[in-house]
């Protein structure tokens, strides 16, 4: 049996191991297409700001082809370094594209104000054609609709500080698009707006240079469909991270945005490790989890072997990303999601609509957290030097905290949320109608009187005796009440206290002419 277990461990390890690179075969190269990337041909700030202005207009032109759009974006992304050409040549290793660099200098004879650097050859017409200045219609389209503030006619500046602020503002909006351009483009607008507000408050960007939604949609779609552009962006991030010492301000901002980009598309794998394994609940000892635990161990080893590109495997369309999906460990993933929902409020909005989602193990994770509340790990306590008396104190405090949390969370759930307007009185609110409405009013009144006379324990019995027979029971609440009557009783007592307080406040406020009405609709708009 020991030999079988060793063979099984070796089999699992080799099964998930990536292919070993061999020198016997040649490198496979695809059919390349050429991408022209304009870069500044001198160190003048005027040249760089004018080039940035023309490239932003070019991207806003709806008639621009895909490769030309990619070249313009690469040119903007590399403008913050001293030598953009050297940077592009150093980090670019793409089997699908061939990058051609074109140096751009100032020119007074071209409509765009720029020309391609050449030895004695007049390239003004070619530069105007590239920057779409040969067609007045396309020029008008690119002239308007790129910045939200229509009063900004151009972004040409003379001083380096102003140029860095404008360039940093534009780059921040482009880099933020990479976070969800591949994984969740439909829901990306909200998160992108939150990042923009954050950097505006930190004075890293200038609010006046917020780009229009159409311009951002064009860039997001291009990032999603062009793997070569994403490869360049990931290579640029890794190159910035390897740079020792102090980095430029724009480079530090890119590293900050990288915290939202890294591990995109790997939420199932990361959250399973966080909530399923790191919490170290005893449920991990179940036989059902044995095989999936070994699978996760192999995947963690594979993740480390992939090196610095592992967090970007989904963005880079690495085929090995399928091994890390939750379908490879469905039971452990379902259990981890149950643990996460109980521990963190942010997990409540996660989408669990997967075909391999197992509700039984999801419930197992929830119950594991609830019943383990207040318990102190003996191993961790010994490592931290926590005495037995301190452990008992911590358990007691944690139990009271958990009980308060459960009493606030458990209770009847609203089937529909209605908003109260200032022009609505209490008599105009929607009613149940008929006999059922009178029964509910009677039960509430008797419950308040019972609470005042006999206290919370007998009031809860009166509440239970007068529940409407036609009221549907919530399945989750009914299950939890049957499993833990104490929690159900505590929840009912809490509700009766609230109803009694509401009754007292109504009696106190009956003498006033105008009731106080709170309208929360504006908070949700």
UniProtKB/Swiss-Prot annotation:
A motif (Nuclear export signal) lies at residues 425-440. Keywords: Capsid protein, Helical capsid protein, Host cytoplasm, Host nucleus, Host-virus interaction, Phosphoprotein, Ribonucleoprotein, RNA-binding, Viral nucleoprotein, Virion. Residues 404-525 are annotated as: Ntail. The keyword Ribonucleoprotein applies. Pfam families: Paramyxo_ncap. Residues 477-505 are annotated as: Interaction with the phosphoprotein. InterPro entries: Paramyx_ncap. Residues 418-525 are annotated as: Disordered. Homomultimer; forms the nucleocapsid. Binds to viral genomic RNA. N0 interacts (via Ncore) with the phosphoprotein (via N-terminus); this interaction allows P to chaperon N0 to avoid N polymerization and non-specific RNA binding before encapsidation. Interacts (via the Ntail) as N-RNA template with the phosphoprotein (via C-terminus XD); this interaction maintains the P/L complex anchored to the nucleocapsid template during the sequential transcription. This is Nucleoprotein.
């Amino acid at each position: 049996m020991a030999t079988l277990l060793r063979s099984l461990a070796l089999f699992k390890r080799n099964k998930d191991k990536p292919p070993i690179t061999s020198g016997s075969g040649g490198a496979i190269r695809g059919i390349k297409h050429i991408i022209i990337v304009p870069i500044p041909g001198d160190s003048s700030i005027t040249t760089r700001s004018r080039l940035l202005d023309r490239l932003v207009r070019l991207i806003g032109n709806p008639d621009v082809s895909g490769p030309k759009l990619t070249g313009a974006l690469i040119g903007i992304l590399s403008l913050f370094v001293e030598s953009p050409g050297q940077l592009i040549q150093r980090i670019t290793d793409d089997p699908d594209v061939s990058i051609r660099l074109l140096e751009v200098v100032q020119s007074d004879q071209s409509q765009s104000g720029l020309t391609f650097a050449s030895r004695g050859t007049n390239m003004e017409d070619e530069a105007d054609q590239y920057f779409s200045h040969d067609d007045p219609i396309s020029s008008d389209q690119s002239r308007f609709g790129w910045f939200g503030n229509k009063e900004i006619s151009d972004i040409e500046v003379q001083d380096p500080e102003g140029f860095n602020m404008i360039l940093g503002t534009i780059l921040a909006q482009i880099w933020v698009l990479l976070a969800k351009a591949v994984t969740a483009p439909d829901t990306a607008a909200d998160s992108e707006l939150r990042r923009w507000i954050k950097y505006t408050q930190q004075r890293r960007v200038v609010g006046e240079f917020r780009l229009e939604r159409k311009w951002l949609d064009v860039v997001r779609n291009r990032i999603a469909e062009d793997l070569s552009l994403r490869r360049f962006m990931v290579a640029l991030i890794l190159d910035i991270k390897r740079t020792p010492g102090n980095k430029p301000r724009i480079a530090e901002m890119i590293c900050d945005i990288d915290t939202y980009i890294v591990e995109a598309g790997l939420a199932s794998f990361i959250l399973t490790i966080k909530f399923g394994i790191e919490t170290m609940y005893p449920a991990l000892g179940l036989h059902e989890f044995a095989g999936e635990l070994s699978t996760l161990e192999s995947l963690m080893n594979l993740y480390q072997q992939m090196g610095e590109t592992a967090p970007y495997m989904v963005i880079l369309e690495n085929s090995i990303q399928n091994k890390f999906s939750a379908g490879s460990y469905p039971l452990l993933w379902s259990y981890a999601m149950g643990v996460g929902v109980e521990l963190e409020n942010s997990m409540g909005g996660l989408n669990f609509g997967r075909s391999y989602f197992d509700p039984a193990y999801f419930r197992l994770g929830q119950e594991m957290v609830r019943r383990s509340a207040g318990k102190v790990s003996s191993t961790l306590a010994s490592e931290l030097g926590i005495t037995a008396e301190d452990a008992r104190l911590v358990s007691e405090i944690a139990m009271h905290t958990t009980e308060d949390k459960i009493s606030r969370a458990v209770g009847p759930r609203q089937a529909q949320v209605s908003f109260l307007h200032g022009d609505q009185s209490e008599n105009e609110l929607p009613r149940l109608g008929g006999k059922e409405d009178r029964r509910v009013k009677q039960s509430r009144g008797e419950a308040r009187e019972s609470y005042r006379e006999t206290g919370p324990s007998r009031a809860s019995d009166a509440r239970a005796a007068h529940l409407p027979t036609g009221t549907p029971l919530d399945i989750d609440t009914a299950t939890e009440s049957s499993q833990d009557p104490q929690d159900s009783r505590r929840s009912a007592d809490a509700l009766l206290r609230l109803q009694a307080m509401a009754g007292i406040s109504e009696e106190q406020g009956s003498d006033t002419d105008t009731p106080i009405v709170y309208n929360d609709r504006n908070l949700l708009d």
